[in-house]
Amino acid sequence: DTYIYPLLRGREVSRFSASPSPGSCVVVPQTGMFGDEQLPATSPQLFQFLARFKDTLETRSSYRRFQRGKPFWSIWTVGEYTFAPYKVVWKEMSGSNFVAAYVGSERMPDGTEKTVVPDHKVYFIPVQTEPEAAYLTAFLNSSSVSGAIGAYASALSLGTSVVDYFKIPKFDANDERMAELSEMGKRFSSGVVPTADNEQRLDELVARIVCGT
């Protein structure tokens, strides 16, 4: 169905690894701030299903506060970023263990490839390319950065502002340091386990990128 996407939950996120459980999906009945008004015509079965919960859906605080008068199937915090080709993700923290990964698309039961949508307890940075996603993932997973985030987790807003907070330079494929960091992020995300030397190299590259050396 047009409005069904693979769902990524926090427990499915680990260091350099994130993948939705088989069959885990979510309904996203819109592409912008409000529910798609064409849904009853384009997906009548889905509309009939959602209509069974109309009263409950209309009592949601986010709906009553921000979307009153809009289709009752509207959900909050949906925009272009929701459907970005790649997302750098990390789960809501309950302790000091910060880890990041990135996701792209997953194959649905009908054979189509659809972008992964994180649930409300997974923070993410939307990006357009895999090299940039791999770069950011490696940057965040370096011991210096992940340790700092973990140490100050209670004082930080761990949304996309983490990029600004740590002044993460924008990815430039022509920068050899960033390109190497990106390749490392991609390699470790494919299942290769980082060695002690790899971990040291991650920290070295991050330090050079931040300091401009």
Q: Language-model segments: what does each one mean?
A:
Residues 1-177:
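Polybasic, glycine- and aromatic-enriched phosphate-binding surface used to engage nucleic acids
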Residues 45, 166-213:
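Non-catalytic DNA-recognition/assembly elements of restriction-modification systems
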